[in-house]
């Protein structure tokens, strides 16, 4: 089993448990160059999204693949979700370690008003 398939296996297990809870989930995906976040409702519809690919977020950043970029995305996704009336979510880290950029995004989202 390689690194990617292990991550996907962890992600599948976590998503199944979140699905059983029936709550909104904050999904995070990261690549070496960008980080993406979505709030998805129990019916699998995207409620809010933010990423470093967006022009408004990218303009304010020096680099899109670092912790500062993750903090900006976390703040943006939380503001957009709260604006749509979603304040409580389950954090879906997509099998990535809760460390570095993933943890920074989560902390920024909590500070901006999301509860998980």
Swiss-Prot record:
Pfam entry (one): Ribosomal_L18p
MF GO annotations: 5S rRNA binding; structural constituent of ribosome
Segment forming the signal sequence: none
Keyword flag Ribonucleoprotein: yes
GO biological process, one term: translation
Record keywords, A-Z: Ribonucleoprotein, Ribosomal protein, RNA-binding, rRNA-binding
Keyword presence, Ribonucleoprotein: yes
GO CC aspect terms: cytosolic large ribosomal subunit
Assigned protein family: Belongs to the universal ribosomal protein uL18 family.
Record text on subunit structure and interactions: Part of the 50S ribosomal subunit; part of the 5S rRNA/L5/L18/L25 subcomplex. Contacts the 5S and 23S rRNAs.
NCBIfam families membership: L18_bact
HAMAP family, per database record: Ribosomal_uL18_B
PANTHER family according to UniProt: 39S RIBOSOMAL PROTEIN L18, MITOCHONDRIAL (PTHR12899), LARGE RIBOSOMAL SUBUNIT PROTEIN UL18M (PTHR12899:SF3)
Function: This is one of the proteins that bind and probably mediate the attachment of the 5S RNA into the large ribosomal subunit, where it forms part of the central protuberance.
Protein name: Large ribosomal subunit protein uL18
């Amino acid at each position: 089993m390689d690194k990617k398939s292990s991550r996907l296996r962890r992600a599948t297990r976590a998503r199944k448990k979140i699905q059983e809870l029936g709550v909104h989930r904050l999904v995070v995906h990261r690549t070496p160059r960008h980080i993406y976040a979505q709030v998805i409702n129990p019916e699998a519809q995207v409620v809010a999204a933010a990423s470093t690919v967006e022009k408004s977020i990218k303009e304010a950043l020096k680099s899109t693949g670092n912790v500062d970029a993750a903090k900006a995305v976390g703040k943006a996704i939380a503001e957009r979700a709260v604006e749509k009336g979603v304040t409580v979510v389950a954090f879906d880290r997509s099998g990535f370690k809760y460390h570095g950029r993933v943890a920074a995004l989560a902390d920024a989202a909590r500070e901006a008003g999301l509860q998980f």
